[in-house]
Regions:
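Walker A (P-loop) phosphate-binding loop of P-loop NTPases
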Residues: 56
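Short, basic, low-complexity termini and linkers enriched in Ser/Thr/Gly/Pro
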Residues: 1-15, 89-107, 173
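Conserved lysine of the Walker
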Residues: 59
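N-terminal pre-Walker A segment at the start of P-loop NTPase domains
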Residues: 11-38
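Short beta-strand-centered segment that lines the nucleotide-binding/catalytic pocket of NTP-utilizing
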Residues: 72-87
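Short phosphate-coordinating micro-motif centered on Lys-Gly-acidic
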Residues: 12, 18, 102, 118-173
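Hydrophobic anchor at the beta1->P-loop junction of P-loop NTPases
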Residues: 51
Length: 173
């Protein structure tokens, strides 16, 4: 199932492949290998991304790849116990083609793992709404735990494990 807002109209689907030399590759429907930031570019000004997938589907792995493609030099790992990790974007580390104003890769990235959040009160007490409405990128695992707090234009990204073991990634904007 793909989560979407009623105003969404374009579907995107990618295959996530592992390459022994290059690491994770994102392949679009035309079979072209694209940068992970291709997803962000297609979503325009949206900054909050809710990642949906079963345990072990690759949510954290893909978010790590995405953060690195955005220019962070920080160690990206699962914030399971911290609930939120903050990564700085180093725009100087980005390739020239990604230093465009429309992508606005600057500031901080907030990476949430909401698996351990007990209820909305706990989420609000830790200041979740301040992160979500900060204008910075927010990548959220197990976002259904805080769904009522999410902005209306949140992009729901579905990661599924296919029968052949490859991962597929889909979203709508």
């Amino acid at each position: 199932m793909i989560y979407c807002l009623e105003t969404m109209e374009t579907n995107y689907k990618y295959t996530i492949k592992k390459d022994p030399e290059k690491g994770i590759l994102l392949v679009n429907e035309q079979g072209e290998v694209v940068d992970a930031t291709d997803i962000l570019e297609k979503c325009g000004d949206r900054r909050v991304f809710a990642f949906d997938g079963k345990m072990g589907a690759g949510k954290t792995t893909f978010i790590k790849h995405l953060c690195e493609a955005m220019g962070t030099e920080d160690v990206v790992n699962s914030p399971t116990f911290a609930i939120v990790n903050v990564y700085e974007i180093n725009a100087n580390r980005l390739p020239d083609e990604l230093k465009v104003e429309s992508l606005k890769f600057k500031g901080e990235i907030y990476h949430f793992d909401c698996y351990r959040i007990k209820d909305l009160i706990e989420a609000m007490d830790m200041g979740t709404e301040e992160y979500l409405y900060s204008g910075n990128y927010c990548f959220i695992e197990w976002a259904e735990m805080i769904e009522p707090l999410l902005p209306e234009d949140t992009v729901w990204v579905k990661i599924e494990v296919e029968e052949n073991g490859e991962r597929s990634l889909s979203f709508e904007v």
